[in-house]
Amino acid sequence: MRSHHRHFSSYVSFILFLFLFFISFSSSTSKLEPAKSEPKRKHSVSAILVFGDSTVDPGNNNYIDTVFKCNFPPYGLDFRNKTPTGRFCNGRLVTDFIASYIGVKENVPPYLDPNLGINELISGVSFASAGSGYDPLTPTITNVIDIPTQLEYFREYKRKLEGKMGKQEMEKHIEEAMFCVSAGTNDFVINYFTIPIRRKTFTIEAYQQFVISNLKQFIQGLWKEGARKITVAGLPPIGCLPIVITLFSGEALTNRRCIDRFSTVATNYNFLLQKQLALMQVGLAHLGSKIFYLDVYNPVYEVIRDPRKFGFEEVFSGCCGSGYLEASFLCNPKSYVCPNTSAYVFFDSIHPSEKTYFSLFRSLRPIYDSILGSF
């Protein structure tokens, strides 16, 4: 039986090597509360504007030529009307909870949705694309929207608003918006650790600096376009993602647990990121700009370390299919789905469940209270 498992594990690893070309991630941590139908406006936040990867993509990939989509069941199982919106989740994302909390809208729509009216645009959209990253090579692997193009879409967005409200009012609107940036996992999990191209050029330390330099350039681009309140998420414990365990653990079927060497890469990256953001803050503070680091790693790791404390039962496999390798088209209407999504930290082999996203939002809420106080 063990021999059979070893053969199966080798076969799975081969499949996963190919499949990892089609992945991206998210963030996580306890108890879901019902959404309010009418969010109350807090302070003077005008809009929420979102950039990044599948952590914060509500469905932009629905409108581009990529296989990395999820606009079909069982995705959206716990969303309103069980709608598979294109979110890599059974329900809402962290940015949906944030938008509701700050009072601008209940859920953040994808910018590329052709049916969006001007009022939806005004209150905020997401430009994010699942599978994207800060390294220019990363989004080419799955043919998704790169970060510079997301910034170009934002410029286009500004022109649309200017046509509606005029240049001066548009600029004020952008200054009063909250910007959310969340990416980076794909750069390491898909790109550096899976494809040999970057490993031939960069040590892991040099690659971390390379990714951060690209992030810095993007943040500077946002600032030049008028962003004044920007949140930047760090990496989660990537060694705890079910698909990473399946691909890189020698005991993927018999003793599933976090792989520390991968998560250490995330902690080191997060340390460097915080230093870089602090330096940028010093340079921009006199202009009224604020950059906030969002710690994703520790809230997620706390859930994984002590899941029952947060109301979870299953940590190292996703709810969809076997939970070891399914995501995107491998998690589909024919897949097995666990009977209780709220018991699972992950919905598929990469992406957290709605409950995990809500738990993460709760852990980040004090930071958003601080941000709201700065408007």
UniProtKB/Swiss-Prot annotation:
The active site is at S54, D348, H351. Its EC number is 3.1.1.-. Gene3D superfamilies: SGNH hydrolase. Glycans are attached at N340. InterPro entries: GDSL (IPR001087), GDSL_lipolytic_enzyme (IPR050592), SGNH_hydro_sf (IPR036514), SGNH_plant_lipase-like (IPR035669). GO terms for molecular function: hydrolase activity, acting on ester bonds. Keywords: Glycoprotein, Hydrolase, Lipid degradation, Lipid metabolism, Secreted, Signal. It is an enzyme of class 3 (hydrolase). Pfam families: Lipase_GDSL. One of its GO terms (cellular component) is extracellular region. Residues 1-28 form the signal peptide. GO terms for biological process: lipid catabolic process. It is found in: Secreted. Belongs to the 'GDSL' lipolytic enzyme family. This is GDSL esterase/lipase At5g45960. It comes from Arabidopsis thaliana (Mouse-ear cress). The lineage of its organism: Eukaryota, Viridiplantae, Streptophyta, Embryophyta, Tracheophyta.
